[in-house]
From Swiss-Prot:
<dbReference type="InterPro" id="IPR006390">
    <property type="entry name" value="DHP_synth_dom"/>
</dbReference>
<feature type="binding site">
    <location>
        <position position="112"/>
    </location>
    <ligand>
        <name>(7,8-dihydropterin-6-yl)methyl diphosphate</name>
    </ligand>
</feature>
<feature type="binding site">
    <location>
        <position position="212"/>
    </location>
    <ligand>
        <name>(7,8-dihydropterin-6-yl)methyl diphosphate</name>
    </ligand>
</feature>
<keyword id="KW-0460">Magnesium</keyword>
<dbReference type="GO" id="GO:0046656">
    <property type="term" value="P:folic acid biosynthetic process"/>
</dbReference>
<feature type="binding site">
    <location>
        <position position="93"/>
    </location>
    <ligand>
        <name>(7,8-dihydropterin-6-yl)methyl diphosphate</name>
    </ligand>
</feature>
<comment type="pathway">
    <text>Cofactor biosynthesis; tetrahydrofolate biosynthesis; 7,8-dihydrofolate from 2-amino-4-hydroxy-6-hydroxymethyl-7,8-dihydropteridine diphosphate and 4-aminobenzoate: step 1/2.</text>
</comment>
<dbReference type="InterPro" id="IPR011005">
    <property type="entry name" value="Dihydropteroate_synth-like_sf"/>
</dbReference>
<protein>
    <recommendedName>
        <fullName>Dihydropteroate synthase</fullName>
        <ecNumber>2.5.1.15</ecNumber>
    </recommendedName>
</protein>
<dbReference type="GO" id="GO:0004156">
    <property type="term" value="F:dihydropteroate synthase activity"/>
</dbReference>
<keyword id="KW-0289">Folate biosynthesis</keyword>
<feature type="binding site">
    <location>
        <position position="59"/>
    </location>
    <ligand>
        <name>(7,8-dihydropterin-6-yl)methyl diphosphate</name>
    </ligand>
</feature>
<keyword id="KW-0808">Transferase</keyword>
<dbReference type="InterPro" id="IPR045031">
    <property type="entry name" value="DHP_synth-like"/>
</dbReference>
<feature type="binding site">
    <location>
        <begin position="248"/>
        <end position="250"/>
    </location>
    <ligand>
        <name>(7,8-dihydropterin-6-yl)methyl diphosphate</name>
    </ligand>
</feature>
<dbReference type="Pfam" id="PF00809">
    <property type="entry name" value="Pterin_bind"/>
</dbReference>
<comment type="similarity">
    <text>Belongs to the DHPS family.</text>
</comment>
C-alpha cells in the first residue's frame, strides 16, 4: 500500500493516535511529556501501528481553541523525539498551516486536516510544496444534511478537487468521512451503512471512529471510552470490508489481528 511516496507493507494499516493534549475526550493528559509520549509510541509500534498521528489540540465537542504557537510547542518536541528514536511514519493532526509547516520541518510525513483545507486556505499549497500526503476529513458547523452519505461524498469530492487544483498530486490525497464530527448518532449510523459509497470516490479512505459517541450508542450507552475498544475493532473489520485502508485507533493491539488477517484478503 502506498501513501504518496511512502510504502506500507500490506493492503491495510493501523494509525495509532497520540494526543499530546490535556483535554482529549479519551486520553487527555496521559502523554503530555516527551518521555510519556515516546513510551506510548514504542508500545503502539510493538502492537503493529504503521503511522503515528500526533495531535496537539483536542477536537472533541466544546474543546478550547489552541493557538498555533501553543500547538507547536506541544507537538514539535514529540515529533522530533519520535523521528530520532523510531523508523515510523508520522502524521500531524492539525488544521493550521503554521503548525503543519513546523511539524513537517520537525520530521512529520503526512498532514491530517480535520477541516480539509477550509479553515486555512494555505494548507493545500503547503502539502504541494512539501510533497506531503494529506488526509481530507469531512467536517461542517451543524448537523444538517439532505442525505448524510451523499452530502459527505459531495464534500469530499469537492475538497479533493480543490487540493488537486492547488497542485497536490492525486496519489497524495486520502479522504476521511469524519465520524463524530457534526453528525448525530443516527447520522453516523447512516454514514456507516453507506461507507462503501465513500470508498468508491476514487481516493483511499481513512476510517476513524475509535471510542467515539456513536460506538457507545451502538453498545447501548453508558460505556466509558476505553470500554469501547472491542466494538471499535469490530467496526474496523466492517470498514476494511467496505474498502477502507487505514484505521485510526487508540488501542492498536485490539485492532492488529483484524488488520493483519483482512489485509491479506483485500
Amino acid at each position: 500500500m502506498k501513501i504518496g511516496r511512502f510504502v506500507i507493507e500490506g493492503n491495510a494499516a493501523i494509525m495509532g493516535i497520540l494526543n499530546v493534549t490535556p483535554d482529549s475526550f479519551s486520553d487527555g493528559g496521559s502523554y503530555t511529556t516527551v518521555q510519556k509520549a515516546l513510551d506510548h509510541v514504542e508500545q503502539m509500534i510493538a502492537d503493529g501501528a504503521k503511522i503515528i498521528d500526533v495531535g496537539g489540540e483536542s477536537t472533541r465537542p466544546g474543546c478550547q481553541f489552541v493557538s498555533a504557537t501553543d500547538e507547536i510547542d506541544r507537538v514539535v518536541p514529540v515529533i522530533k523525539a519520535i523521528k530520532e528514536n523510531y523508523d515510523i511514519l508520522i502524521s500531524i493532526d492539525t488544521y493550521k498551516t503554521e503548525t503543519a509547516r513546523a511539524a513537517l520541518e520537525a520530521g512529520a510525513d503526512i498532514l491530517n486536516d480535520v477541516w480539509a483545507g477550509l479553515y486555512d486556505g494555505q494548507m493545500f499549497a503547503l502539502a504541494a510544496e512539501y510533497d506531503a500526503p494529506i488526509i481530507l476529513m469531512h467536517n461542517q458547523d451543524e448537523e444538517v444534511y439532505q442525505e448524510v452519505t451523499q452530502d459527505v461524498c459531495d464534500f469530499l469530492g469537492n475538497r479533493a478537487q480543490a487540493a488537486l487544483d492547488a497542485g497536490v498530486p492525486k496519489n497524495n490525497i486520502w479522504i476521511d468521512p469524519g465520524f463524530g464530527f457534526a453528525k448525530s448518532v443516527q447520522q453516523n449510523t447512516e454514514l456507516l451503512k453507506g461507507l462503501d459509497r465513500v470508498c468508491q470516490l476514487g481516493y483511499p479512505v481513512l476510517f476513524g471512529i475509535s471510542r467515539k459517541r456513536v460506538v457507545d450508542a451502538l453498545l447501548g450507552g453508558n460505556t466509558k471510552a476505553k470500554e469501547r475498544d472491542g466494538a471499535t475493532a469490530a467496526l474496523s473489520a466492517y470498514a476494511l470490508g467496505k474498502g477502507c485502508q487505514i484505521v485510526r485507533v487508540h488501542d492498536v493491539k485490539a485492532n492488529q489481528d483484524i488488520v493483519a488477517v483482512l489485509s491479506q484478503l483485500m
